[in-house]
Amino acid sequence: MGKVCLALPGATLDHPFGDHHDAYRIGGKMFAMVGEMGGISFKVSDIAYEVLTESGRARPAPYLARAKWVNLERIDDWPDDDLAEHLAIAHGIIAAKLTKKARAALGLA
């Protein structure tokens, strides 16, 4: 999923929580994180949060649930296209919160 995240406009990778967690960011703000055990957490809309968590397709992300992040313990349970779409949406949600100047600098304006 790292390739999918980094293919999104302006996306970067860093390791603020140690080498075992890949954090994907847009404009310095995180939109997805992959853990060493193969799980992934990402930002979703309020509606997607309710649908995904209530249906059992995802669980509230530890430490990030109040900000409407979900966690998938096993990404191989999801179709690649479905997960890629959710990651693109997560990227878009976070990018939309950037200032107009920051979006323009990233080529997103």
Give the location of each predicted region.
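Charge-dense, helix-prone N-terminal extensions
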Residues: 1-109
